[in-house]
């Protein structure tokens, strides 16, 4: 299985590169961060050209994530919506056949350290790791992200 993760930093700005990547590398699963686009239909129609089904959490101007995969991959979305802060987005899927959970997220930026943004980031991360621990033990977990360290 070929899985690619990319902080695309604007889907529209990187469309030609993304098209080339998909056509050349032929990923089974493609996880993008920082889509910087509000229109979910646009994201899904872009990937439909390549016969990739797509789940996306979008937000205008910044953030946003998507998971796209080949049509024959059996996936189930896990809603971790309580993790969505203003600056954070996530998609989480289970690939039942592979016993694999993929979490693709955009961590909130916590700068500066002595700010409420930093406290919110730490709380968001604690919630994320609690959610991960609550998943089935017989699944492998793959966390893909723009973390903002």
Residue ranges and their predicted role:
Residues 17-20, 123, 127, 131:
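Alpha-helical elements of Rossmann-like donor-binding domains used by nucleotide-donor carbohydrate transfer enzymes
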Residues 147-149:
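Conserved small/polar residues in nucleotide/adenosyl-binding loops
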Residues 128-144:
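His/acidic metal-ligating clusters that form di-metal
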Residues 35-110:
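Structured beta-strand-rich core segments of catalytic domains in phosphoester-bond hydrolases
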Residues 1-46, 52, 62-65:
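N-terminal, active-site-proximal structural segment of metallo-dependent hydrolase catalytic domains
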Residues 31-32, 102-104, 140-145:
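A structural signal for short, well-ordered beta-strand segments and their strand-loop junctions
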Residues 26, 98, 137-141:
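Short coil/turn segments at beta-strand junctions that form active-site/ligand-binding loops
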Residues 81-83, 107-128:
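Surface-exposed cleft-lining segments at the edges of enzyme active sites
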